[in-house]
């Protein structure tokens, strides 16, 4: 019984790590997309670079 509890706990831990990895991946992709959009916007007009939407590009 102890062994099955340990296995179950390990599987639950692995599932939680996968969920965290998926969320981290999604957030990283959104950040990358935001940077690309910001760079395109800045190449079109410099007023976009100073906007609150893309503060990292100032």
UniProtKB/Swiss-Prot annotation:
Q: Please outline how this chain is modified post-translation.
A: Contains 2 disulfide bonds that can be either 'C1-C3, C2-C4' or 'C1-C4, C2-C3', since these disulfide connectivities have been observed for conotoxins with cysteine framework V (for examples, see AC P0DQQ7 and AC P81755).
Q: Which GO terms describe its cellular component?
A: extracellular region
Q: Which organs or tissues contain this protein?
A: Expressed by the venom duct.
* Location relative to the cell: Secreted
Q: Which UniProt keywords apply?
A: Disulfide bond, Neurotoxin, Secreted, Toxin
The terms under GO molecular function for this entry are: toxin activity
Propeptide segment residues? 1-20
Sequence similarity: Belongs to the conotoxin T superfamily.
Q: What is known of its domains?
A: The cysteine framework is V (CC-CC).
Q: What is this protein called?
A: Conotoxin Ar5.4
Q: Which organism is it from?
A: Conus arenatus (Sand-dusted cone)
